Amino acid sequence: MPLNKESKQAVVAEVSAQVAKAQTVVLAEYRGITVGDLTKLRAKAREQQVYLRVLKNTLARRAVEGTPFAPLAEQMTGPLIYGISEDAIAAAKVVNDFSKSNDKLIIKAGSYEGKVMDKAGVQALANIPSREELLSKLLFVMQAPVSGFARALAALAEKKQGEAA
């Protein structure tokens, strides 16, 4: 069903608002994917706060015009699904993880910090641990010396009590 001018403007405004807040945009070709699989992808995207949208490439080009993602316009050909996220790696991770289990979803390109990435670049970005994972690893590394010191003190106190008895 063709969109009228007002609805096209509304779509461009909605996508432009998402792009303005985004750190990452990922494009993937979805030719041949079933509705059920696409629904699963959308559910995973929602869980990760990734804005996922199938839209006409001309409207997508208008939405990214004048943003750091404008160079992606050259890659916008064919049936594409757009993953847009404020988190630097969430969109890449959602699309990459889904493409591993569904060979019909083909990562085409992406953009992060104004740089256009090919499929390998998007996959590399997706393999970076999330902020939460990195913070938990940092916390573990910071706690290790303290907990080791505490165990040594406890062992020393136990030894002293054993000698006193």
From Swiss-Prot:
Q: Which Gene3D superfamilies match?
A: 3.30.70.1730, 6.10.250.290
Report which superkingdom the organism of origin falls in.
Bacteria
Swiss-Prot/TrEMBL GO biological process terms: translation
List the keywords (alphabetical).
Answer: Ribonucleoprotein, Ribosomal protein, RNA-binding, rRNA-binding
A GO molecular function for this record?
Answer: large ribosomal subunit rRNA binding
One Gene Ontology cellular component annotation held by this UniProt entry = large ribosomal subunit
Cited function: Forms part of the ribosomal stalk, playing a central role in the interaction of the ribosome with GTP-bound translation factors.
Q: Which family does it belong to?
A: Belongs to the universal ribosomal protein uL10 family.
What does the subunit comment say? Part of the ribosomal stalk of the 50S ribosomal subunit. The N-terminus interacts with L11 and the large rRNA to form the base of the stalk. The C-terminus forms an elongated spine to which L12 dimers bind in a sequential fashion forming a multimeric L10(L12)X complex.
Q: Which PANTHER family does the annotation name?
A: 39S RIBOSOMAL PROTEIN L10, MITOCHONDRIAL
The protein in question is named Large ribosomal subunit protein uL10
Native species: Paraburkholderia phymatum (strain DSM 17167 / CIP 108236 / LMG 21445 / STM815) (Burkholderia phymatum)
Gene name tied to this protein = rplJ
